[in-house]
């Protein structure tokens, strides 16, 4: 239980004790509410004016019990309040409140489960692309260190396998989730939980063992990745064709921020049009890499490729070109 939660609990207990004692004094002593309430407050504060004292046996007995319980509750609460300020919880509390306010405003964001080596790289890439994201990790110290370096990060301390934690990250409004915690079993469980809470969310999950890849897909992951396989394949490509790989990397890492994106054709004006007559290249400047029709993907589509509503277009270009393409194929002015 967090310190501020202990303070809230202590205050609630104190208020309940005061109200209960007030009712008892009204009942056994016959006092009006204000007199009973006043006496209860004075007693628990240990001021002890002595202007009102119970005369009945039950009244005196209730005050004895009340004093022990009340003084204990006050001491507990004051101790936590002191700890709240002395141990730096005050700053942490308001940082948490501010962060939760930012999370409430999130929409169409990504959730990164696990802030280890992979999680940090993913977060850096998202920051470069100005993509909103939330980090979930159970290591509080790790996230505090990350926030010291970058106060703009949005982090949640907790177990990503917990539905409550995923709900805190607004999973119902999230666009995607990336599960890169250290345990394959946890990645499978996170995938299952995420799909249950948001069936439409796009999930990429990490597998330490190649044998886990199929399990992640069956659990609901849209993509399952084994870093060792991907890393090994990349190293092999670099060794075999260093010039080609370097060229591809230079394209992606240019100052113009070249990217590859996918869009669904929604513009009715493009329905049943040939690619060469669509005006995509002329109006946007983006290059079409592939067109996906149902389960069939046409790579390097020829000019006579027919475009239909619902087709998925994979395109390459600058951010500005791709934004123009997005507006054009989706029919947004």
Swiss-Prot record:
Homotetramer. Keywords: Cell membrane, Ion channel, Ion transport, Membrane, Potassium, Potassium channel, Potassium transport, Transmembrane, Transmembrane helix, Transport. Residues 1-6, 82-333 are cytoplasmic. The chain crosses the membrane at residues 7-27, 61-81. It is a multi-pass membrane protein. It comes from the Archaea. Pfam families: Ion_trans_2, TrkA_C, TrkA_N. Potassium channel protein. Seems to conduct potassium at low membrane potentials. It is found in: Cell membrane. The keyword Transport applies. Residues 246-331 form the RCK C-terminal domain. Residues 107-229 form the RCK N-terminal domain. GO terms for cellular component: plasma membrane. GO terms for molecular function: potassium channel activity. Residues 28-60 are extracellular. Inhibited by barium and cesium. A motif (Selectivity filter) lies at residues 46-51. InterPro entries: 2pore_dom_K_chnl, K_chnl_dom, NAD(P)-bd_dom_sf, RCK_C, RCK_C_sf, RCK_N, Trk_Ktr_HKT_K-transport. This is Potassium channel protein 1. Its main location: membrane.
